[in-house]
């Protein structure tokens, strides 16, 4: 990853776009498919890089920034349930200094002179849930989903042993939130059963819990030994108690399972003592934990702290260090991605790390192999933190055989055998054979049908591979003629291995439904290099309709300078991305395919939707010292109400809130005749919004 301190604005734009796409894909795999693609530590590194870039270039923050998102978009398998208040993620702390910074932020935000008590709880590695009770009866259970909308798992949650279906002396309306998990021994037993029945084993206990809970047949869930802890009262918690400590006592009285291994701390030293205790004893616990959660204990102070887009300010998760293992590197395979990028993957002698068997690890890129001097038959060190594909951190040189040789970077594509293109500035190697490369064509079709693109459920990896191998599809357009081809064929798809009448009917129904698609999704589905969801939305907003989009792209490919400049002026689109767009539309097959898709699809014009309120979109500047609230708290409140907080006064400023010792900003506001109010007026204003 590039040095953030040295990165240019243009490089930052490109990197933020790449990070948004990559993290969104990892979120979908983790939250929806229950199939993590990268280690927790690697994910956290990418997420923190995104945050640092946004802090350095706040004007480049994307609409689909990972810092604004919580989980991943939900599937269509279960009914949707909207959470009354979002089920947010937590920010992370990785060392003692991060925790000290967290404590200092609380003090500064709330203007406290002394340590505010912090409640500490183990961070359970499971699946988050919400449960609603009305008049003491369990009526609804839901997953976290994307944080705002979850999946209805009411029938499944009722099968969990000791999960209350009825509560005595409960309020008229009650919500509880917590974590559903599977104990280590039950996980091993379940995997043994899976293996005996010829089914795929679960990668880790979290995947097993998530996969067991998200079953359409609740009787399957009932057969799994799921357990739970509650830790929150959701929308109702502040009606039940005045602190986190009191809340857990109350929830236990109602009959819920709460984690007894928790502690109210009154100093940083007590926090670190509790953390070390859990870190040392985690292997002795019957369930997996991956850190400690710290929450401001007082609910009134929590209310004042509030939230940022993705997480509460009053809580953080202190992660445990990754688990390290060592095993033999058997071989290095090379995968070819949708845009031709080659990625090396280490094939390993299976090793158990933290209760999970690992046989593959990412090597990221070929420079990484050279930098670490990783060789076949080496013994390598692995770092794992709740992941499926961990990271290789180094080589045990002392165990290296004498006859090993350095890994040769490939010269030809392993899929189509064409000569490879080296792009040292991108640290990548690419196959430029496009759709003539079987691997790229396969990945392009996979991308086209994916959840955030055309969203054709029933076309997973195996199905796409099968249809290509049988010659039933060779490009995205063929998908929409698959039913027609099947109807006229003597050998029906439903009679082939892996298919049945119902699955084929559902597939054709899903293909038909996907024909109605928004312009941003369609552009994203095309798989243009560096055009992720955010840039697809930018292009859709700029051109408005499919017809205008394709017409302008054809002009761009003919070097129309007006279109080039118009796109270059868009925030998020730069010279490098424009070159990728031009290269894509320079290929005649691409343009022909898009035009034919336009004939069979109903591509909806772009529509901008914005939620309006009296402060939405207003630009506000705070200056000087406010008597009773911190600037951070005032800014947070303004942003929560939809306003934009600026650092300087300009003709675009709508309102200036001035405190004591307001200086040049106040003077400039007067010169520009901008409305100026004090703290008292500000507090009245936000109270009435």
Curated annotation (Swiss-Prot):
Belongs to the NAD-dependent DNA ligase family. LigA subfamily. Its EC number is 6.5.1.2. It catalyses: NAD(+) + (deoxyribonucleotide)n-3'-hydroxyl + 5'-phospho-(deoxyribonucleotide)m = (deoxyribonucleotide)n+m + AMP + beta-nicotinamide D-nucleotide. HAMAP family: DNA_ligase_A (MF_01588). It holds the Pfam family HHH_2. The active site is at residue 123. It comes from the Bacteria. Gene3D superfamilies: 5' to 3' exonuclease, C-terminal subdomain, 6.20.10.30, BRCT domain, DNA ligase/mRNA capping enzyme, Helix hairpin bin, Nucleic acid-binding proteins. One of its GO terms (molecular function) is metal ion binding. Zn(2+) binds at residues 413, 416, 431, 437. DNA ligase that catalyzes the formation of phosphodiester linkages between 5'-phosphoryl and 3'-hydroxyl groups in double-stranded DNA using NAD as a coenzyme and as the energy source for the reaction. It is essential for DNA replication and repair of damaged DNA. The keyword NAD applies. One of its GO terms (biological process) is DNA replication. Its cofactor is Mg(2+); Mn(2+). Residues 610-689 form the BRCT domain. GO terms for cellular component: cytosol. This is DNA ligase. NAD(+) binds at residues 40-44, 89-90, 121, 144, 179, 295, 319. The keyword NAD applies. Keywords: DNA damage, DNA repair, DNA replication, Ligase, Magnesium, Manganese, Metal-binding, NAD, Zinc.
